[in-house]
């Protein structure tokens, strides 16, 4: 019955799964795995409160059942009970200090949720200490590179003091608002049907291309301090998508070209003061333009300006008919977080791999990221070329 329940769960037939798990429980009422599996089925069916009872029962039977702790933490996370979620992830780390998913979930929560200073989890202690560091680097005056270097060095020391082996596979630093753009949903539509969702036709981005990792760090601080009328979503990242050219990028999300142009007026003096980055407006995601080149056109008065095809709407409805567990988006807390520092270390590894020597201006003793090395292994030559091309275009002698 347990195996049959697992099969129905994989087929997304959650009611049938629940029936079979309950039959299994009747036969083996002290079997922790069955309770956990039933909780997973209920969780996927969005019966979150009910799933929590079964995860707790599984833990009651087996107090060292890590999967049940993890699933319970995720259920609390979905319900926005962040302190409860962190408590469960922390209990996992007491059982297995190297459980990377529990570590990452705590790190992610700390991007938008403040935890009591009394919490003794080493990740939280490090994050709270990072919040106390004051940076001399700001876009309001002429800052020195040494200010940036000292700031990062002090931040890294805090993490190493509390979590020597802590890493992340994330490479993008976001400054989010509470508006969910639905990007995961839109890519499900695109990947399944090879069409561009209607929402994305009104999505425009200001793309900023820093010329080095040093410039990317500067852009991060600009984005962190930037005050915009609508607190637009923004992010800094290194390019790792195999078919998308470029190296270092920053994006500000806008709902129209008009809004993008207004924001460009605000940010251009700041960007030009601290960096040599190129600024442009682009439409939607780069993956869309690979399949539909005309989607790149941002001038609606041009003949080749692409418009949404109404027949695509029925395909979108197919995706929307599928119940998906969507976590609520919340405003990112200002200031440096442990997530930011770990991602910055990945940026420095990326820079070292592509021969961008400006990483030495920030920190010569970077911590090796096997994740970055593996991600770049099949695209290292093209990234090195992208970097050299960027230098030539901006006429910068690094």
Would you name each region that the model predicts?
Residues 2-10, 21, 33-44, 67-77, ...:
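Conserved alpha-helical positions within TPR/SEL1-like repeat arrays
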Residues 78-80, 96-218, 235-237, 298-398:
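Charge-rich, low-complexity segments
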Residues 212-213, 254-261:
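Helix N-cap motif at beta-to-alpha junctions
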Residues 219-223, 263-272:
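Short amphipathic alpha-helices in soluble, non-transmembrane regions
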């Amino acid at each position: 019955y347990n195996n049959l329940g697992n099969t129905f769960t994989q087929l997304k037939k959650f009611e049938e799964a629940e029936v079979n798990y309950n039959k299994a429980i009747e036969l083996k009422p002290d079997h922790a795995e069955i309770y956990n599996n039933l909780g997973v089925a209920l969780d996927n069916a969005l019966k979150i409160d009910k799933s929590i009872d079964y995860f707790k029962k599984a833990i009651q039977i087996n107090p060292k059942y890590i999967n049940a702790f993890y699933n319970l933490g995720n259920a609390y996370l979905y319900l926005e009970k962040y302190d409860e979620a962190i408590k469960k992830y922390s209990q996992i780390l007491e059982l297995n200090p190297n459980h990377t998913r529990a570590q990452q979930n705590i790190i992610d929560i700390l991007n938008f949720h403040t935890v009591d200073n009394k919490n003794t989890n080493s990740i939280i202690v490090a994050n709270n200490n990072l919040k106390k560091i004051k940076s001399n680097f700001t876009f309001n005056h002429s800052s020195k590179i040494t200010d940036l270097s000292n700031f990062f060095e002090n931040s890294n020391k805090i993490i190493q003091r509390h979590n020597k082996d802590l890493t992340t596979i994330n490479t993008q630093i976001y400054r989010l608002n509470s508006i969910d753009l639905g990007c995961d949903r839109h890519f499900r539509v695109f990947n399944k049907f090879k069409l561009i969702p209607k929402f994305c036709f009104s999505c425009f981005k200001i793309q900023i291309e820093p010329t080095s990792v040093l410039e990317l760090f500067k852009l991060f601080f600009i984005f962190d301090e930037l005050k915009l009328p609508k607190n637009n979503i923004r992010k800094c990242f290194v390019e790792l998508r195999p078919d998308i050219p470029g190296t270092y990028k920053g994006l500000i999300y806008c709902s129209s070209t008009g809004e993008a142009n207004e924001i460009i007026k605000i940010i251009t003096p700041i960007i030009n003061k601290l960096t040599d980055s190129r600024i442009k407006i682009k439409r939607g995601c780069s993956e869309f333009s690979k399949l539909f080149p005309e989607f790149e056109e941002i001038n609606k008065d041009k003949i080749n300006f692409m418009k949404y095809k109404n027949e695509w709407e029925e395909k979108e409805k197919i995706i929307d008919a599928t119940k998906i567990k969507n976590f609520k988006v919340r405003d990112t807390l200002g200031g440096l977080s442990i997530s930011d520092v770990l991602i910055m270390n990945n940026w420095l590894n990326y820079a070292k791999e592509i021969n961008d020597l400006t990483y030495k201006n920030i920190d010569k003793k970077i911590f090796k990221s096997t994740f970055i090395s593996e991600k770049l292994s099949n695209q290292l030559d093209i990234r090195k070329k992208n970097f050299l091309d960027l230098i030539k275009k901006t006429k910068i002698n690094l």
